[in-house]
């Protein structure tokens, strides 16, 4: 595991440099991505994310925020030294994680509210996403997908391959097509790998897409390392998967640096045995303040504490930024702590 630099920091200002007219003239998503998806290896394929430029969003145009620049509670890219970042975005009672390295950027889930998501992306200067990975169809993970249309340019949307034609996911496919300006959603399966600069996202499970419910959530292993070199840091992204779903992968995954806790820290999100094997230094929970579900539960917080994890929650900390380097993982939170 990489050493952890957990000194949370504030950044006083987010400056937005480009005018609203720029986004009208953005080019279409890179064709190389479509070519890369055209050939599938027998057990494993790599989906190369070539990297759109992550240009600053224009606050007045996209989010309607006034007086954002200079706010002491906002975290800007660069508040951690590395360009390689995984950011648990504060989207209320939902999940959205931004993975970026230089010009490459991928979003894992979107949360529910398009306005909230766009504000979160604006805080980090993101106007283009090479891909959006949807763990499952629930509105708190996929509800904001269609809201990206015409605002944030999206190269690809990926769901489980079994859901590309499934009746249960007609609305999800429609939202994806809207975000993709009429293009189609694409399928992934265990063994597929999405690359984001020096990051790789390997799909571990499930084998079957099911009905795209919580238990059918896509579980991704996020790894960071120098290209062609050894893995320097690892994280497990579980969607709304809980103990039963984590049980299918945790022994193969082994020691990780951070865990994106499943199902917003629900009662059965993770157990002591899984924590003993995974040993995450950080546990990230996407959760809304004062939610009606009691998330995160005291039971799960106790499991995480016994497992030695530092718990960071979007309801308390806002956006949680992990900055990766060959030496350490630096942690920055929007609200401090």
Task: Write out the residue ranges for each language-model feature.
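Non-globular, low-confidence helical/coil segments that flank catalytic cores
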Residues: 1-337
């Amino acid at each position: 595991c990489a050493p952890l630099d957990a000194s949370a920091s504030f950044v006083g200002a987010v400056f937005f440099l480009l005018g609203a007219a720029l986004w009208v003239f953005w080019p279409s998503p890179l064709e190389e991505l479509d070519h890369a998806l055209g050939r599938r290896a027998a057990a494993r394929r790599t989906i190369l994310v070539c990297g759109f430029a992550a240009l600053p969003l224009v606050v007045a145009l996209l989010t309607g925020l006034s007086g954002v620049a200079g706010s002491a509670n906002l975290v800007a890219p660069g508040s951690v030294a590395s360009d390689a970042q995984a950011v648990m975005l504060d989207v209320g009672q939902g999940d959205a994680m931004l993975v970026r390295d230089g010009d490459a950027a991928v979003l894992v889930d979107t949360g529910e509210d398009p306005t909230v998501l766009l504000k979160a992306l604006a805080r980090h200067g993101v106007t283009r996403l090479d891909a959006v990975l949807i763990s499952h169809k629930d509105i708190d993970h996929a509800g904001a997908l269609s809201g990206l249309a015409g605002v944030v340019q999206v190269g690809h949307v990926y769901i489980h391959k079994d859901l590309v034609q499934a009746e249960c996911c007609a609305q999800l496919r429609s939202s994806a097509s809207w975000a993709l300006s009429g293009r189609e959603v694409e399928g992934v399966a265990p063994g597929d790998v999405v690359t984001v600069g020096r990051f790789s996202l390997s799909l571990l499970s499930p084998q079957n897409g099911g009905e795209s419910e919580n238990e059918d959530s896509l579980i991704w292993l996020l790894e960071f390392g120098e290209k062609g070199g050894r893995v320097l840091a690892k994280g497990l992204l579980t969607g709304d998967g809980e103990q039963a779903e984590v049980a299918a992968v945790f022994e193969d995954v082994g020691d990780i640096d951070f865990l994106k806790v499943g199902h917003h820290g629900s009662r059965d999100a993770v157990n002591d045995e899984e924590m003993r094997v995974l040993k995450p230094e950080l546990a990230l929970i996407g959760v809304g303040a004062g939610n009606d579900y009691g998330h995160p539960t005291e039971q799960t917080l106790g499991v995480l504490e016994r497992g030695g994890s530092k718990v960071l929650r979007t309801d308390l900390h806002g956006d949680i930024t992990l900055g990766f380097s060959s030496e350490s993982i630096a942690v920055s939170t929007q609200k401090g702590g």
